[in-house]
From Swiss-Prot:
GO cellular component, one term: autolysosome membrane
Subcellular location per the Swiss-Prot or TrEMBL entry: Autolysosome membrane; Endosome membrane; Late endosome membrane; Lysosome membrane
The organism's place on the tree of life at top rank: Eukaryota
Gene label: Plekhm1
Region (Interaction with RAB7A): 657-1059
ZnF endpoints (Phorbol-ester/DAG-type): 989-1043
Motif (LIR): 634-640
Positions of the PH domain: 536-627, 686-780
Record SMART domains: C1, DUF4206, PH, RUN
Domains as described in the record: The LIR (LC3-interacting region) motif mediates the interaction with ATG8 family proteins GABARAP, GABARAPL, GABARAPL2, and LC3A/B/C.
Organism of origin: Rattus norvegicus (Rat)
Record-given protein name: Pleckstrin homology domain-containing family M member 1
Amino acid sequence: MLSVENGLDPRAAIQVIKKKLVGSVKALQKQHVSLDTVVTSEDGDANTMCSALEAVFIHGLHAKYIRAEAGGKRKKHTHQKPLPQPVFWPLLKAVTHKHIISDLEHLVFINTDVGRCRAWLRLALNDGLMECYLKLLLQEPARLCEYYQPTALLRDAEEAEFLLSFLQGLTSLSFELSYKSAILNEWTLTPLSLSGLCPLSELDPLTVSGAELQRKESLDSISHSSGSEDIEVQHSGHKIRRDRKLTASSLSLDTASSSQLSCSLNSDSCLLQENGPKSPDHSEEPMSYDSDLGTANADDSDRSLQEVLSEFSKAQVNSAPSSGPSQESDTPMFQTPLSLHSLANSTHLLFEGSEEPFPAHTSSGTSSGHKHQPQESPDMQPLGTAQAGPAGSTSDQQPSSPVAGAADQGSEPWKALEYGRVGPKLVVSSPTSPKGKSWISEDDFCRPPKEHALKNTSDLCISPLQGTPELRTALHGPFSQGPRKSCSLGALDKACVSSLDYRNAQTAPSPAVTQDHKNFCVVHRRQMGLSNPFRGLMKLGTVARRGAMGIWKEFFCELSPLELRLYLSDEERTCVESCSLLRCEAVGPAHSDGRFELVFSGKKLALRASSQDEAEDWLDRVREALQKVRPQQEEEWVNIQYPDQAEDSPEAPPDNLPPYSALLPEHAGAQGIQPNWTSAQVPEPDAIKESLLYLYADRTWIPYIFSLSLESLKCFRVRNNEKMLSDSHGVETIRDILPDTSLGGPAFFKIITAKAVLKLQAKNTEEAAHWRDLVRKVLASYLESVQEAVTLAGSLDENCQEVLKFATRENGFLLQYLVAIPTEKGLDSQGCFCAGCSRQIGFSFVRPKLCAFSGLYYCDFCHQDDASVIPARIIHNWDLTKRPVCRQALKFLAQIRAQPLINLQLVNASLYEHVERMHLIGRSREQLKLLGDYLGLCRSGALKELSKRLSHRNYLLESPHKFSVADLQQIAEGVYEGFLKALIEFASQHVYHCDLCTQRGFICQICHHQDIIFPFEFDTTVRCAECRTVFHQSCQAVVRKGCPRCARRRKYQEQNTVS
């Protein structure tokens, strides 16, 4: 297998893929769910997630589906091995609709099967169908065997189940990923390394050798404009390789803002343009080195940053057009403003002005030797213009530029770099410095908005650094820590300021640095003077949780800024519960005994700490996490004042936001008609909330009156001043309700049901928030009533509840009818709609059919007269008749058929007394349980044989009162008694003939006969209820003096008391 040949075990590759996938999805949820923003290809975490998903499909692929690279940029470097190109497009076509296949195969810039595979994955994420596609693939094991080896991730049942459950977290995200880019035509290094086809060492950013540098020039770092342009750079420094070729991709750093670099290089004619068509979506594919796989030390960072500025300054001088002095003075080289926001994520540049002129260094790298004319007035120089000085000229003709600084993050030390005696002072905060004394993380800083940052730097006068003898060509970004914490080269290429005084940089801090230090404000978190040993964890410890039956059980609890996790113990890292803080609705008070409650959407956690103080500390940390994970109100933030932009600025900042009306999508703002929110209709009698909302349907917004009750959400159309029922959604079909600002603003939200997603618009933000709050409360009330209907009846224990939640995700509302006879409410209560598909039934429509299991009405498609016994009618009425049920109920009964969900002793114990057959069955079940105790202690292996005969119903040996739907069906058919008798006969014969089991029998202490008797012999023996000793039934009836053993024990106790 290729992964083994490359030194990576297939199982280890799976863990690497899972770690990458989990980390990227959690980062996306943290960044986008609370703000309801759309995930695009500009997000580094989104590209990391795509790479991990691509690695899922590549892992374990058969060798015949992996071919060598047919072309690409790695072919330019003959000393490198070509990247393998795995192809699984025929497998994807088997589960994809023909229209989608046709669209992907007719994309203009996607012309390879590799490109179609990668485009298919991104399109599936955009459509929210990734989980659905994966389910379809896993249902076809024959195809998976054809394409994948036995050790592949997709052929591992447990790993595939984990992947399915984890992909459900993507439902809270909206994707708009680019899938039409020509970059997708070839595999990048990241998914191949994660899947094991390439060594993981190729992703290591610490290597600074030339070969490793060229390996970084993969498609991971190519954008729209920098895909194929090369810059011929010839340096005179003795440490420069003269045959070195600088490409735009090699000049890039790990950044999610690659389009800034490509646009700045392309628009200013710094690169040679390539002929031929360009992909319109290239700019949407960010550049990534995946540098989170390693961390560089400070020295490597210093060297790499120095090389970045030096090498790029050379590229500016040598690649400038040489058409004459007039062209040099009229054509600005760089006009994109400096973005401090991108710089502040990973590096901090400090430019310090000079009062003393010094001679500028000349560059020998110019190709034509033209001398540039100095500007007559430095004030007339356009903002952001890069200008090269003449050979031998002095820099006193240009004044020093204002200082632009960036604030230190946290309390990490500053490190200064310098270029000989001249050049900018580059300051880098070490990303892994252990000297920080604060618990405050990067997310606790409130950075200024981008437009303010641009205003603060609009007065910079930029000019390139001219050659220095210490330049080298190595170019890396080892100081970057992931795609989001990256340094934009679009800012670094303009960070070359002339007339800098190195001595002033060491003596006096710049005023801009002081100002930027004041601009950063800490909004929350504790400062304890010590470094946080558990980075990312806010609190951990042991708490007790109250179960369904009121029993407290201890768990090891971890609180992170995003979720609360419960483990079995601190050693056994088995997660039994994970609650997202995004769904936390209320935090209860701490009681004197340490009890406190956390209320989430659909469930409530009852927890208990060791003391009240400990409980209050838990609540404080939860509130702190909630404040951090949820967006705060605008009035709570500190207003940061910035100097106004100069009036003579040649251009306005490019990041000025358009008016709010321009941000509205076409379907929300292009109507041209103002919504009418007036409604004079009488509310429904059972309505909790009823108001006018606009529903998005058929590419337009239509007004409807929505009425919410404890049982359903009804939708009415107003015609002739009368309400006409248009649709009805049962509360049991509602999955979630979420804000959706992407539709046009905070007044928009969506309701996710089992049948459709309702996109709605309320009158204002408060009205939308009120609707979301009420729907969540109604849904929580319904789920609580369903749980009480079964749990309080004693039919479910905690283990069965977990199994049931997994098995009945879609039909969980039918659980309430398992032990309770349904009440028929009539067709009018359903609004004349089918309870399964919302099709209109009754009257002149389809004839309604009653489901005997749920008491609801269905159409002829959802109800096809399938017959089944009704468990609730057997339990309460001993009604063994088969009745017609809907297909939904039949599927539900099949899903839970083998689960022991009914405890007859708690639901209806009188059934044993009133029904003779149930009395005999209960007697046989007790015998079987006692025999199971004997076989469980025997070492002969008889228990395994008995388990085979049980047909996986091991609960028969655990409790005599637990029954499943399969047991009730066999009781109705009359075969259950024979099944139990066969089991009792087998087990009793073993006990009678086993030497070990017979030694655990009893001798009657009344007659002292040598015959061994057993407690499961109900016909001839009787057992003392107190000491559990077994006697002959005839001997006990004759003596009538009670249990001799109990009498002796009481006598001994009296003697001990007297003595």
